[in-house]
Amino acid sequence: MWQCGSCGYMWDGEEAPDKCPKCGAAKEKFTKLEDKAADIVERSRFTNDLHMQLYVVLEQVIAVAEDGIDDNLDPNCVKIFKRAAEKAEILQQSIKAELQGHMKKGKWG
């Protein structure tokens, strides 16, 4: 596994690419990750993907809740929809914070 020193792009392969697919940096800008670091990246990919999938589902929760708030059938319904939207937003922010922590610890790529 290789990482671009210019933009951080991770490349899976035995050799670095001729140029970075993201930023176009030359092959020389890539550094090979040590096995332990590469293992951490590989291990974290599944969990990071789950976080991103959950984030998308929470976007749907917010959209449904907003529709329910707009529908305004009765106060109890609106209360539930508002609570759902608030909780979904908190969870989304928590996911962003968690992923940022993963990036700082090399658990991303």
Predicted regions and their residues:
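Residues immediately within or flanking Cys/His clusters that coordinate Zn2+
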Residues: 1, 17
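Short cysteine-rich clusters marking metal-coordination/redox-active sites
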Residues: 4-7, 20-23
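Short, flexible, mixed-charge glycine/proline-rich loop motifs
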Residues: 8-14
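Short Cys/His-rich micro-motifs in 6-15 aa windows
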Residues: 23-35
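Residue-level signal for alpha-helical context at structural boundaries
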Residues: 25, 37-41, 106
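Long, charge-rich boundary regions
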Residues: 33-94
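C-terminal, charged low-complexity interaction regions
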Residues: 96-109
